[in-house]
């Protein structure tokens, strides 16, 4: 699963997901894409599950580009721990997604195959998405 090799700081604030995505909201590499319509955190496991389903469905001559990367650590405290004694340890990584962000791009396949692959990958995502073309 995806995670940064090294970061400047081990822990981050949770932050707020306001507004729409102005970066990464256009198709750059392929002809078809899956675009987010809601704000959310998408975990590295969800990104990998979507990538695998697209690869499995569009394996004949198609190319996939994953346009998001999980760079935010999410901390959790051990179960049945008393309050206090600092912030928990990092458990998993997420990518902060705002509306309009391109999640995956596809090229080298027909539109029907790309649309079907994007629909299957959209079931793996915790947000509403839409299929877009160039």
From Swiss-Prot:
Keywords: Chloroplast, Plastid, Ribonucleoprotein, Ribosomal protein. GO terms for biological process: mitochondrial translation. Coiled coil: none annotated. GO terms for molecular function: rRNA binding; structural constituent of ribosome. It is found in: Plastid, Chloroplast. InterPro entries: Ribosomal_uL16, Ribosomal_uL16_bact-type, Ribosomal_uL16_CS, Ribosomal_uL16_dom, Ribosomal_uL16_sf. The keyword Chloroplast applies. GO terms for cellular component: chloroplast; mitochondrial large ribosomal subunit. HAMAP family: Ribosomal_uL16. Belongs to the universal ribosomal protein uL16 family. Part of the 50S ribosomal subunit. This is Large ribosomal subunit protein uL16c. It comes from Pinus thunbergii. The lineage of its organism: Eukaryota, Viridiplantae, Streptophyta, Embryophyta, Tracheophyta.
